[in-house]
Amino acid sequence: MEERKTIYLCLAHMSEAGLEQKYVKEAFDTNWVVPMGPNVNAFEKDLEAFANSKSDGSEELDRKVVCLSAGTAAVHLALIGCGVKAGDEVLVQSFTFCASSHPITYLGAKPVFVGSEGETWNMDPVLLEKAILDRKEKTGKLPKAIVPVALYGMPYRIDEIMAIADKYGIPVVEDAAEGMGSRFDGQVLGTFGKYGVLSFNGNKMITTSGGGAMICRNAEDANEVMWYATQARDAYPYYQHTAIGYNYRMSNVCAGIGRGQMTVLNDHIAHHKHVQSLYEELLKDVPGVHIHKQPADKRYDANFWLCAATLDADVKIQGQENAYKEVIKTAVGGAAGVIHAVDSATTDCQPNENVEALRVFMLGKKIECRPVWKPMHKQPVYEGAPVYTNGIEEELFKVGFCLPAGPYVTDDDVKYIVESIKEAIVR
């Protein structure tokens, strides 16, 4: 019998026409192997065409896109564009990956974490306004920016968030790193606020191997972002700088991959939605397992980058008695790089034992299954940071997990995954 392949959460998937290789080869053939060039320019135009489109075919937007070396770089430059400086405060969704909040600290500013509401799992507008008013009372000034996050591709309550932001005159940086192609009321996420952030990491909806982009409201903002991304050089015949710049521009080689990927973006989005629909159907009668669905409000149109679910605390999983008995030796979830060794297998805020047992069981079935993001306000690095929460994101972290949804995940894979979940449950 052929050995079963590992089913990963979301793997990079190239176009069948091999266009990624074509454009990369062109970069080498013409010696455009620097962070500028024809591929970068064309990729930006392709992204603009997509970002400015409306699903109902109505009048298009006129946003501009700047390609960068990473989504994290885009968050960093967006905060600079919002005027964030040392000592300022930035309101950011707590239930997110660390790249949403770390750039705040790069600038010497302070993250103020905002909790989630239970339907989208994203920033709660009620808590957002509460945080704005309380920070103004405590510090005498308003926060400098608001950073909502499209968790696993789910649109945030952008209409309510923008109304609050406009009310207090605070710019919005949309972290749509996980939400490439998600829409609200037909409009692409990342095009509502002052800036929008996209990610093309190897596990995202499309990839450039590593990379990201910033959506800007106009050419003036895009030019400023470009200036900061290319070391902020002034117009002299020698190198002079009146501001601190960064080396954040995307490589022309990587942009070639992105150009090819744009030809399959809509196919990828459709596939992820199809996988989500299969999970919803196949898991609907599994007691204690609940797939996270988008709101019934038709304005919400998620890309379902990853399919997330929750596991009731009273569901017993095979091997649960051994959960957290051993210290993890390698990164969980396909993370690259080096992890810092720890002495204990547990922390004061972690997934329930049955969720950890399910992760281990699924790993034995060659299925990648990982916990949802740990809220940033519960991370040791942010100990003591202000937080406005109702506890929803902490509870979701205890019970939530992610399932494979990428382009390589077949219908049979989804059926196998669901059968494995059923097998894991002790009856």
Roles of regions detected by a PLM:
Residues 102-104, 164, 253:
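Hydrophobic/aromatic ligand-binding patch that stacks against planar heteroaromatic rings
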Residues 38-45, 52-53, 59-62, 126, ...:
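PLP-dependent aminotransferase class I/II
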Residues 76-130, 134, 331, 346-347, ...:
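Conserved PLP-anchoring active-site segment centered on the Schiff-base-forming lysine
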Residues 1-81, 85, 129, 166, ...:
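Conserved PLP-binding active-site segment in aminotransferase class I/II-type PLP enzymes
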Residues 119-208, 213-215, 220:
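Active-site phosphate-binding strand-loop segment of PLP-dependent enzymes
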Residues 107, 167-168, 365:
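Helix C-cap/helix->beta junction micro-motif
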Residues 88, 94-96, 115-117, 176, ...:
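Nucleotide-sugar donor-binding loop of glycosyltransferases
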